Amino acid sequence: MIEIHEAPPVFEKLIHHNEAKHERVYLTINTFRDVEYLSIRKYYQDFDEEWKPSREGVSLPLDFDNSRNLFDGLVEILSLTEVKDILENHFKDKLDQIYLE
């Protein structure tokens, strides 16, 4: 029986590579039993130096609601990160006084 993480990808993008741990994380879109899935999955390098999917990851049916919710979440996270960077850059001294003293 083929597992969902073994189905051939329709789209694949490397989104993280940890060379020291021989790990990669890929964003993929694949079809399994006639359903398209969006997956974020960790891959490991086997003894033959081939990249293999691990069981660590998540797969969601690729539909409008899941895509929109994922996009909304990423936009919110990126906005918070951007705001955090701006606050740290412009108010670092004040924040250090508040939180480190």
Where are the language model's segments positioned?
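Intrinsic-disorder/low-complexity coil detector
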Residues: 7-8, 52, 60
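Mixed-charge, Lys/Arg-enriched low-complexity segments
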Residues: 56-101
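Negatively charged, low-complexity tracts enriched in Asp/Glu with abundant Ser/Thr
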Residues: 1-20
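Enzymes that process phosphate groups on RNA ends and nucleotide/triphosphate substrates
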Residues: 16-30
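Solvent-exposed, flexible loop/coil residues
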Residues: 19, 47, 62
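A generic structural micro-environment signature
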Residues: 21, 33-35, 66-68
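A short, structured beta-strand/loop element
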Residues: 26-56
